[in-house]
């Protein structure tokens, strides 16, 4: 079966929210690929990703300098395998529990 969804998560100094976000994304039952792009964080985000999530997400990309959100998304593009792609900000502005309804709407059109 093909992967339904690729979730790209660009992060920069998100030590206060990234763990909670990744747990929510991982707990979502939709068939997904998770790509995290760390845009040269300096607050411990990088270490947290390595120590807690390197074997739980599909891909972690580390930028050697801060390049911005657009560059983070672009870095992930070549690894996308999902039928659909979502850019999930690390600040939890968008709830991962909405993935099913977003996919359902996309499938209708």
Stretches found by the model and what they are:
Residues 1-109:
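Structured catalytic core of nucleotide-sugar glycosyltransferases
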